[in-house]
Each structure stands twice: as C-alpha cells, then as structure tokens.
C-alpha cells in the first residue's frame, strides 16, 4: 500500500538512529479517520467545510481582480475619455439648451460601459484560472495539517501543455476594445502577468498522498526529513510532534480525538457483535444433572444382563420407589416386589411345620434392612464411576476438537488435505469480513468459526441438561457515546481553527465560515510557505463569505479606476457628480431632476476647459 521507496544513499544518510514518523500504524489511522473509516459522526462534517477550497479561490480571485484593475493611470483613463467624447460630439452636435444633460448622459454611458467591459474582461479570464485543474491541492494540505501537523511538498517543472495554455491566455487578456484601448490594454497586461504567476505557482508545487510519503526524524540533527519516490522533498513542520521513547505523538486535532474516536468505534463494534450473537433469541444455560441417569443404567442392564437378573430387579425397585411420592404408592411397590420374589423361595417353616416368621415376612425385613442399603451403596459407587468417565470423555472430546481446528488452520486452502481445503477457504473468506460493514451471514459464520467463542446452544452430552433458558437481546448503548463524540469534534475544530458558526433565527447552525484567525492559522501558511505566493494578500474574513458578484462590486468601488472616473465626472459634469456611485450617475428619483437644497445654495461653477463644444 505504501511506497517505502527511499534509495540506498538516503537510507545511509538517515542512519540507525532515525525514528519513523510516517507511515506507522498510528499515523495511517489518523488519515483513515479523516476519510470516515472509523466512527464517522455528524460533528465530523464540519471538517468538510474546513477543507473546502472556496476561501482560497476567493483569495486568488480578489488578488487578480484587485491587482489588474488597479494597474491603470490617470492619463490612460483621461485619454480614453477624450477619445470617446470626441466621437460622441461628431455624431451628436451639442445644443446649448441641453448641454448639461448631454454631458451627464455621455459621461454616464462611458463610465458604465467602462465598468462592464473591465468586469467582463477580468471575470472571464479569472474564472478560467480558478476552474482549471491545478496540481496543488488545498484539500490535501488540510488533511496533512489535521492529521500530522506537517505538510510535504514536491517541486515539479512546468509542462509544455501548461506553457501553451499560458500563451493562449495572453491573447485573451491583452485585447483591444474600441474607445478604451489604453486602459483595457494596461489592465489586461497586468492581469496576464498576475495570472501567469498564479498558474505557475499552483502547478509547480505538488502535495502527495499520505500513502506516497515517508517521514522520519533525525535526533542527532533535530530535523524531520521526508522522501517521495526515492528523493528528499521539502517538509513544512507547522506543528512539531512530541517524540518520547520512540513513540510519536502528533500535535493535531485528530491525534487529540484519537482515543475517543476508537472508544466509540469499539463500542459500535461491540454492539454489532451483540446484535449478531442475539440474532437467535433463545439461549439456554447447560449443566450436568443426575436425575435421569438411572435410565441409562437400566438401558445398559437391559442389553447386557440375563432375563432374570437380581441387579436389574433391585434397581427397578429403587427406581419405582424414587418415582412414587406417596406412602401408599411406596407400599404397593414393596408388596409387588416381595410377591414376585417370594414365589421363587421355599418356605421351610411351612414345609417342616416350624413356628416363627414366614418366608415372606423375613424377606420383607431383609429388604428393608440390608439389601436396600447394600444396593444403594453399590449404585452410588457406579454413579460416581459413570460421572468420572463422562468427564473424562468430555475432556478428550475437547482436545480432539482443538487438534482438528489447529490442523485445519495449519493446512489452509493449499494444504495436503483436499477435504479440508474447501472449509478452510470458507473460513478464510469469513475471517476477512468486516464485522461492522460485512454481511450478517458472513459475520455470524466468522463468529461461529472463532475458537475463542463458545456459541453452543444445544445439549451435546449425555449427562447435560438445561438448567435455565431465557431470551437475550442485550446490545451495548452507543447513541450517547456517538453524541458526545459529535460534540467533541465540533469543539475541537471550532477552538483549534477559530471557525465562526452561521445560525438562523432559531439558533440552528447552517454552516461555518472562516474567521480572520482561521485565515491566519490555515490559509496563511498554505499561501506563503507551500504555494509560495508572496505577492498575494490574505483575503479578509468579510470576503471569505461574500459571493463573487458582491466581491466584484466592493473591489471596483475601492479601485483606482473608479476613483479616476469619479474625478473625471466631477470635473466634466459637476452638477450631477455629487451623489453618484464613484463617478457613475445614479438614476433620477421619482421627484424629478430637482437639485438638493445644499446644491442650490452653492454658486454655480464654470465648466472646465474643453468640456463641451
């Protein structure tokens, strides 16, 4: 993924004491966070406003427009005006009765035409520059600042294709307009020179991707070095990181948010795992129980014993006694057992006529005193032995399963066992699935194939029984943590870069804009250090949010051209110059062409020489 392509001479210069700064697992994760890979929340959308190059585009537009329109002289404007006036007088002979209105109309037409011509010339060519593809990326610059606080920059030569575009731009800028040749030519020439500088600067510097750069720290010289495609490049360290015991901690917003972001991400991952595990809602607690163990013993005796086995008969007696809960039921069971057993005995008292207990009475007494106790001890001993064998069986089964899983994992898809290749391929595919973004079936298969997950939900052993069952749907709450992370993102970006929120009447934030501090912190280093645009003046926070049309109007009002035109208007038609918009006469009001009171009180001045016929 990464181009660790430092040549041998460069690596020898680094020495063994160089500390890797980027790429490392920590630095790569910072860029992946900016790309939305881990816990992308609503507060991170402010970062999209931060990396928007619109403010830089307005700065370039303001610089080009202001520089071009200010590159004109009073003599050029006066020459163009005299030329225009002479042409008008040839076509429209003046009349003394309406000379004042004629001068006003003539000057208003010329000043408005001049403004529209200059505006069209500048905006058309500046738009071509702003919307053309440039090598320098403001978005990558913001990514490097927010992730590491350092910006690598690569110098590259201007291509021949770009030279051809600059040459064609000269033909468009340096043009001739009827009546405004000298002024428009001066403005167009300066626009071409300024545009050429901007285009060459924006296309001679390149900010590479974070996957293409290697950055290391040299403790001996206390400097950071960057390498791109095997050669050393410039590295602007705006916010130096902290290095302790070989660990690099960047001084950046994402580094400060790193811990909270991954806490939220792991919580979301935990919630997803719980959701997958609880897809089957019925869960059971399985344990060992001995209540029905006698059934296995009876089945064993039934298969292996003789037809009339004393052990079987006595065990049946004990089973029937345990199943009866009443005294009458126990009495009936004992009487039935004695009756069956006494039929096979010879009663010597009855045979020889001896007095005393009968055989049935003696048998009953013997059963109640001796036989039951002996058989109970024997059966308990057998039960203990069976339990031990069951535990030993389960232990060996677990060992066998563990050995099978290890063998299957070691063989893999290309192993010698063809029967295990298909399951191994399925397991490998399931293991590559992302739990958060992968399909539910693949994620569940991945969890069930994990050797550390005990996901059995059935009674597998002969000596196991369900102790309790319940419906489990627990999912860790993550909404509060996501909300906290959103607020933390907003607070970090607002306070680090001094952004200004724009809200509506209800207090809801619509968007954020650059403040004067944001321009100094973020746009200043990009303009003067990275792009090396030293003639460009930083845009003000007012222009950072205005539209292009509004910026044009503001720049034209404060330009030299507007001041020169206003001065010509005062000299040529002094009665109507006051109240005009920098020499451009406003439309008359609904009250008519009446003069204001302060104009009536002043004595009328003579027109300047050369004004009129």
Swiss-Prot record:
Keywords: Host cytoplasm, Host nucleus, Viral genome packaging, Viral release from host cell, Virion. Residues 577-613 are annotated as: Disordered. The keyword GTP-binding does not apply. InterPro entries: Herpes_Portal. Residues 592-605 have a biased composition (Basic and acidic residues). GO terms for cellular component: host cell cytoplasm; host cell nucleus; virion component. The keyword Repeat does not apply. GO terms for biological process: chromosome organization. Its main location: virion. Signal peptide: none annotated. It is found in: Virion; Host nucleus; Host cytoplasm. Homododecamerizes. Interacts with terminase subunits TRM1 and TRM3. Forms a portal in the viral capsid through which viral DNA is translocated during DNA packaging. Assembles as a dodecamer at a single fivefold axe of the T=16 icosahedric capsid. Binds to the molecular motor that translocates the viral DNA, termed terminase. Belongs to the herpesviridae portal protein family. This is Portal protein.
């Amino acid at each position: 993924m990464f181009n660790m392509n430092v040549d041998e001479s460069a690596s020898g210069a680094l020495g063994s004491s160089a500390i890797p700064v980027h790429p490392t697992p920590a630095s790569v994760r910072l860029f992946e966070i900016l790309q939305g890979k881990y816990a992308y929340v609503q507060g991170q959308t402010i970062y999209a406003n931060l990396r928007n190059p619109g403010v830089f585009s307005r700065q370039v537009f303001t610089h080009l427009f202001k520089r071009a329109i200010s590159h004109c002289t009073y003599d050029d404007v006066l020459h163009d005006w005299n030329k225009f006036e002479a042409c008008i007088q040839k076509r429209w002979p003046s009349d003394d009765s309406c000379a004042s209105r004629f001068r006003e109309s003539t000057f208003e037409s010329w000043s408005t035409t001049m403004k529209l011509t200059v505006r069209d010339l500048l905006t058309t060519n500046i738009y071509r520059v702003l919307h053309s593809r440039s090598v320098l990326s403001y978005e990558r610059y913001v990514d490097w600042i927010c992730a590491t606080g350092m910006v690598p920059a690569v110098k590259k030569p201007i291509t021949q294709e770009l030279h051809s575009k600059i040459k064609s731009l000269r033909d468009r800028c340096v043009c001739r307009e009827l009546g405004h040749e000298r002024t428009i030519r001066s403005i167009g020439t300066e626009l071409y020179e300024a545009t050429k500088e901007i285009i060459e600067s924006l296309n001679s510097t390149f900010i590479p991707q974070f996957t293409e750069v290697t950055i290391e720290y040299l403790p001996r010289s206390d400097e950071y070095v960057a390498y791109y495609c095997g050669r050393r490049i410039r590295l602007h360290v705006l916010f130096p990181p902290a290095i302790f015991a070989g660990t690099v901690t960047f001084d950046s917003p994402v580094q400060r948010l790193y811990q909270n972001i991954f806490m939220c991400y792991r919580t979301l991952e935990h919630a997803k795992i719980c959701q997958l595990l609880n897809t089957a809602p019925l869960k059971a607690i399985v344990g060992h129980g001995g209540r029905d163990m006698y059934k296995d013993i009876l089945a064993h005796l039934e298969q292996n014993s003789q037809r009339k086995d004393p052990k079987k008969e006595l065990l049946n007696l004990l089973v029937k006694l345990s199943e009866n809960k009443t005294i009458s039921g126990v009495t009936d069971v004992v009487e039935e057992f004695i009756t069956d057993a006494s039929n096979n005995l010879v009663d010597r008292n009855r045979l020889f006529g001896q007095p005393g207990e009968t055989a049935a009475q003696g048998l009953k007494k013997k059963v109640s005193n001796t036989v039951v106790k002996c058989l109970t001890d024997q059966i308990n001993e057998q039960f203990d032995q069976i339990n031990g064998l069951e535990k030993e069986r389960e232990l060996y089964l677990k060992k066998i399963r563990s050995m099978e899983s290890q063998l299957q994992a070691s063989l893999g898809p290309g192993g010698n066992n063809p029967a295990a290749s298909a399951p191994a391929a399925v397991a490998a595919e399931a293991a590559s699935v992302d739990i958060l973004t992968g399909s539910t079936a693949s994620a569940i298969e991945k969890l069930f194939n994990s050797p550390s997950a005990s996901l059995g939900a059935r009674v597998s052993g002969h000596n196991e029984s369900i102790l309790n069952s319940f419906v489990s749907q627990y999912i860790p709450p993550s909404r509060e943590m996501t909300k906290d992370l959103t607020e933390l993102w907003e607070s970090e970006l607002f306070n680090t870069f001094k952004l200004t929120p724009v809200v509506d009447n209800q207090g809801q934030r619509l968007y954020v804009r650059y403040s004067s501090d944001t321009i100094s912190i973020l746009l200043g280093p990009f303009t003067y250090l990275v792009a090396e645009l030293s003639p460009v003046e930083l845009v003000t926070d007012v222009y950072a949010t205005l539209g292009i049309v509004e910026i044009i109007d503001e720049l034209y009002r404060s330009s030299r051209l507007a001041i020169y035109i206003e001065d010509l208007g005062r000299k040529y038609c002094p009665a109507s110059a006051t109240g005009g918009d920098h020499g451009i006469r406003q439309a008359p009001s609904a009250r008519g062409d009446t003069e204001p009171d302060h104009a009536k009180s002043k004595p009328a001045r003579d027109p300047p020489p050369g004004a009129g016929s």
